[in-house]
Amino acid sequence: MLRLFSLISVLLFLPQWVMAGQITAKGSDTMVRLCQRLAEEYMKSHKQTVIQVSGGGSSSGIAALINGSTRVCASSRLLTDAETRVAVTKGVKVFQLVVALDGIAIYLHKSNPIVDLTLGQLRDIYTDRITNWKDLGGPDRPIILYGRENNSGTYTYFQQQILGGEDFADRCEPLPGTAAVVHAIAHDINGIGYGGIAWATSIKYAGIKVNDSAQAVLPSAANVSDRSYPISRELYFFLNGEPTGETKEFIDWVLSSTGEKVVVESGYVPVRAK
């Protein structure tokens, strides 16, 4: 009886993901919808496995991977140098794989007459150099900025790739997830926001031009797949070491044709061109 009690006590205090048949996936809010669909479909044919999915942002997922509280980190960005150093210090050997492609779409209200923007204009909008739609050929109305919180991989990617490392304008309203950004733009005729292409409903996309003389490109699956859309990116799973056991079975399934079908059905772009 004492031995049984001791075993139960140990199990109660083990991290949840240590238990057999349980996998946790935590991180990117951009990827939550994808991870939920992948988990649901996988568990239909693997009834002995429980996959728990949560968001919180790429930074939170990476921190959870490093501290051992999640088995799979979903991230819309790579690790920073600082995160890599902490991982090494903690003895975490980060294993990286690309599970899908995505484009960062620029969201506008459906009634906004603006059709396209250059990368330079985007930078100037989000750093407060351009503050009125009339400066872009639109109506004389203020541009209302919406973005993501700084624990978001999308925030980090946008700041690095579009703003060139500059800070966002102080008046940019940070929102906790892509769905919140879409909701804000749908209800603000003067708003502009950014986020993944899988989330856009009730709003419209702006075409993106590399420069004034370039052709505008919309964030379609085809344009993300061939990288003609200027703000295309990879979506990652990070693990501590190469996957084994149940985790490997799940990862192999995600990368299979069955998993890629779920990627497409969820509104994301498969790694392998169709």
How should each PLM-predicted stretch be described?
Residues L14-A20:
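Sec/Tat signal peptide C-region and signal peptidase I cleavage site
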